[in-house]
Amino acid sequence: MKGYAMLKIGESGWIEKDRPVCGPMDAICKPLALAICTSDIHTLWEGAIGERHNMILGHEGCAEIVEVGELVKGFKVGDRVLVPAITPDWNSLEAQAGYSMHSGGMLAGWKFSNFKDGVFSEYFHVNDADGNLALLPDNIN
């Protein structure tokens, strides 16, 4: 699949990557509408979170679910969803203590374009789908 990535600090471009794999609590989504954020700019041009190589950018948007894990209860293939910038692991000790932004370590709740590929791609992975996605109502287009 194609994705728009930070190749290194100060350099971006289109790259090819494998389609993400869906875990039992996760979802694979296809973007419908995306938004660039100043965090993407700071990450790319200033290395705000350190050097990243071939890391697909983007961490906010709307999408259609194309695959769900067998333990996902609240979503199905074809659902349109809102995807937040912060997607913690809700079963982590940090999230349970109220620090979801730091689930798994400092800033580890901010996964897209930080610890894993972001949403500026043909498909992207959302961990813990039941806790990290919101259904987009049918009357909103």
Language-model features and meaning:
Residues 20-34, 45-96, 137-139:
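Glycine-rich beta-strand-centered segment in the early N-terminal region that forms part
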Residues 89-141:
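NAD(P)H dinucleotide-binding glycine-rich loop of Rossmann-like/cofactor-binding domains
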Residues 10-15, 38-39:
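Short N-terminal binding/cap micro-motifs at the start of the first secondary-structure element
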Residues 7, 18-19, 52-58, 111-117, ...:
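Short Gly/Pro-enriched turn/cap motifs at secondary-structure boundaries
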Residues 41, 74-76, 103:
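Short, solvent-exposed secondary-structure boundary/capping segments
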Residues 1-4:
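Short structural boundary motif marking the start of a folded domain
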Residues 8-10, 23:
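Residue-level recognition of beta-strand termini and adjacent short loop/turns
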Residues 39-45:
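Cytochrome P450 core scaffold surrounding the K-helix E-X-X-R motif
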